[in-house]
């Protein structure tokens, strides 16, 4: 690893630790020439995959878009950012492990709903109302009845 201060390649790792569910390694390094310390991270490069939208269009999977939709559903709910990030990462790693190069949005939506059902029922209803395109109050009543009877959708 090249030192960012003197450009020497003569560096040494002083400390390493695994973070983000063992998907990222943080290394503390020291340059043996100028003695400066710096931090590097190593991240597993995962394959990219496509998402097939309801209208048939495809686009590259966007982890930030997934996070944003979950943040909207969990807004002002007693859900930690750590829990949300863990959910997003778990969904991403599960999707990444699939053999398909193109994954339909309904598969991703189902995974989000299953995770939100376990995490927070109100966030689950919020997400479901958009994902399942609720049209009237009966749609809300039906999903709430399922929650009360503790059936996963």
Curated annotation (Swiss-Prot):
One of its GO terms (molecular function) is ATP binding. Residues 49-139 form the ATP-cone domain. This is Transcriptional repressor NrdR. Keywords: ATP-binding, DNA-binding, Metal-binding, Nucleotide-binding, Repressor, Transcription, Transcription regulation, Zinc, Zinc-finger. It comes from Ehrlichia chaffeensis (strain ATCC CRL-10679 / Arkansas). PROSITE patterns: ATP_CONE. Negatively regulates transcription of bacterial ribonucleotide reductase nrd genes and operons by binding to NrdR-boxes. Its cofactor is Zn(2+).
